[in-house]
């Protein structure tokens, strides 16, 4: 019911905040995947090249996904 949705929303907001505040991390492999990360200094989703492994949660395949999760 309502209580579960409230708890679920709380955890989603905590996860969302943590992901969006993580720094850009290209990873340690040498692939070249175009991705987007949320730049907390500018408040915008910015393109970068992801190496394919490692990295963190602030790594989105599309601009739309970055904006939707980080509310940019």
UniProtKB/Swiss-Prot annotation:
Disulfide bonds join 20-70, 29-53, 45-66. Belongs to the venom Kunitz-type family. Sea anemone type 2 potassium channel toxin subfamily. Serine protease inhibitor that acts on trypsin (Ki=190 nM) and to elastase. Does not bind to alpha-chymotrypsin, cathepsin G, and kallikrein. It significantly increases neuroblastoma cell viability in an in vitro neurotoxicity model, being a consequence of an effective decrease of reactive oxygen species (ROS) level in the cells. It also protects cells by inhibiting ATP-induced purinoceptor activation. Its binding affinity to P2RX7 is moderate (Kd=45.5 uM). One of its GO terms (molecular function) is ion channel regulator activity. Residues 1-9 form the signal peptide. Keywords: Cleavage on pair of basic residues, Disulfide bond, Ion channel impairing toxin, Nematocyst, Protease inhibitor, Secreted, Serine protease inhibitor, Signal, Toxin. Thermostable. Optimum temperature is 25 degrees Celsius. The ability to inhibit trypsin slowly decreases as the temperature increases to 7% inhibition at 100 degrees Celsius. Negative results: does not show activity on all potassium channel tested (Kv1.1/KCNA1, Kv1.2/KCNA2, Kv1.3/KCNA3, Kv1.4/KCNA4, Kv1.5/KCNA5, Kv1.6/KCNA8, Shaker IR, and Kv11.1/KCNH2/ERG1). Does not exert any effects on TRPV1 channels. A synonymy between H.magnifica and R.crispa is controversial. The record marks 30-31 as: Reactive bond for trypsin. Residues 10-17 form a propeptide. This is PI-stichotoxin-Hcr2j. One of its GO terms (cellular component) is nematocyst. Residues 20-70 form the BPTI/Kunitz inhibitor domain. PROSITE patterns: BPTI_KUNITZ_1, BPTI_KUNITZ_2. Coiled coil: none annotated. SUPFAM superfamilies: BPTI-like.
């Amino acid at each position: 019911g309502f209580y579960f949705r409230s708890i679920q929303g709380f955890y989603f907001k905590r996860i969302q905040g943590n992901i969006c505040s993580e720094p850009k991390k290209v990873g340690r492999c040498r692939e070249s995947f175009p991705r987007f990360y949320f730049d907390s200094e500018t408040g915008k989703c910015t393109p970068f090249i992801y190496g394919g492994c490692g990295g963190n949660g602030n790594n989105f395949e599309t601009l739309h996904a970055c904006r939707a999760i980080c509310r940019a």
